[in-house]
Curated annotation (Swiss-Prot):
It is found in: Cytoplasm. This is Vanadium-binding protein 2. Residues 21-29 form a propeptide. It comes from Ascidia sydneiensis samea (Vanadium-rich ascidian). The gene is VANABIN2. Changing residue 104 to A: Loss of Co(2+) and Zn(2+) binding and reduced Cu(2+) binding. InterPro entries: Vanabin-2 (IPR021544), Vanabin-2_sf (IPR037242). One of its GO terms (molecular function) is oxidoreductase activity. Keywords: Cytoplasm, Disulfide bond, Metal-binding, Oxidoreductase, Signal.
Amino acid sequence: MSKVIFALVLVVVLVACINATYVEFEEAYAPVDCKGQCTTPCEPLTACKEKCAESCETSADKKTCRRNCKKADCEPQDKVCDACRMKCHKACRAANCASECPKHEHKSDTCRACMKTNCK
């Protein structure tokens, strides 16, 4: 009876160890979420775009109205948001895709595939 209990305890311990290792592995290789990391700097831009959409609801040409509104009102926030995302993507590229993305080949298919997988 004690051998059966010992075997069950051993199995439970092994399963717990395997699960902990899997969780650590999954967290270590999770893609970098640049959009999520830049939520705070991009909040004013999102609010500005929503404001433009609301103000252009009564316009006859909504598409042109929104484009002009975004260009006139949202451009400063857009630069801050773009700078945050660019910084995040550069850091992610250097950390995860250095061999696939040499200095001047950021548009190659292998580089894009690596960036898509690792830097969302």
